[in-house]
Amino acid sequence: MAKDTTGRMRVTVKSGGRMKLSSKLWLDRQLNDPYVAQAKRDGYRSRAAYKLTEIDDKYHFLKSGQAVVDLGAAPGGWSQVAAKRIGSANGRGKLIAIDLLEMGEIPGVTFAQLDFLDSAAPDKLREMLGGDGADVVMSDMAGNTTGHRKTDQLRIVGLVESAAQFASEVLKPGGIFVAKVFQSGADATLMNQLKRDFATVKHVKPAASRKDSSERYVLAMGFRGTQPAAQEPQEP
C-alpha cells in the first residue's frame, strides 16, 4: 500500500493471471474510490447515491409526499436516496422504480420490471400512480457502450432523449426531470427539447462524478405541460 496525495492509503492491484488491463484499472479505481467505501458504510447500493444527494442538496427538488419515477433504477442507489427524501417508506409519497433488470426490494419503493420505451409504459405508470402524474422523473442510465466514442455518445444522447420524452408524457405541470448525460456536441436536439418543455434547464456536475469523466447531469425544472397539437384550419 501507498499513500495518495490526500494522505489516504492507496490499494494497488497487481496484474496477474488473465486479468485484462481495463479490468485491472477499473478494480484499482473502485478499491481507491472514497465514495465506494462510503457507500458501503452508509448502506447504499452504489456510489451514484451521492450524486443525487449532492444535486438535491443544492436544488431541493425532492420533497415529502411527492410521486417520483426512477428510470433504469437498478441497482437502486438513487431510489434509496429519493425514498428517504420523499418519505415513501412512511407513506408520505410514492416512488416507482423501473428497470429491465431485477432489483432487490427497497423500503418505500415499488419496482416495475418493464421497458420504459414500450408504448404502453406511460399508461402502466399512471395506473401505478393511481391515475395521477409524477412530480419528478429521474434517470441515471448510461446504456451499453461499444468502445467507439462517437457511437457511444449518440446512443447515450438517444437514450436521454427517450427518457425526456417519457417524462413529458407522465410529468405533472411544474414537474422536474433530472438525467445523466455526457458532455459532447451531440446533445443540441436534447437541450432544445428540454428548453421547449421546461422553464429552467441547467447542467450540473456533482463532486461525486469523477473528475476525469465527461459525465454530468441535466436538471430541467418547471415542466410546462403537454402542448396540444396544432389543429389544421378547416375549409369554409
UniProtKB/Swiss-Prot annotation:
One Gene Ontology term of the molecular function aspect = rRNA (uridine-2'-O-)-methyltransferase activity
| Keyword terms, alphabetized | Cytoplasm, Methyltransferase, rRNA processing, S-adenosyl-L-methionine, Transferase
Q: What class of enzyme is it?
A: transferase
Matching entries from Pfam families are given as:
FtsJ
Q: Name one GO cellular component term.
A: cytoplasm
UniProt main location, coarse:
cytoplasm
Q: List the disulfide bonds.
A: none
Q: Which residues of the sequence carry a binding annotation for S-adenosyl-L-methionine? A: G76, W78, D99, D115, D140
UniProt subcellular location? Cytoplasm
EC numbers: 2.1.1.166
Q: Where is the active site?
A: K180
Stored InterPro entries: RNA_methyltr_RlmE (IPR050082), RNA_MeTrfase_FtsJ_dom (IPR002877), rRNA-MeTfrase_E (IPR015507), SAM-dependent_MTases_sf (IPR029063)
SUPFAM superfamilies listed in its UniProt record: S-adenosyl-L-methionine-dependent methyltransferases
Reaction(s) the record says it catalyses: uridine(2552) in 23S rRNA + S-adenosyl-L-methionine = 2'-O-methyluridine(2552) in 23S rRNA + S-adenosyl-L-homocysteine + H(+)
- Family of this protein: Belongs to the class I-like SAM-binding methyltransferase superfamily. RNA methyltransferase RlmE family.
Q: Function, please?
A: Specifically methylates the uridine in position 2552 of 23S rRNA at the 2'-O position of the ribose in the fully assembled 50S ribosomal subunit.
Stated name of the protein:
Ribosomal RNA large subunit methyltransferase E
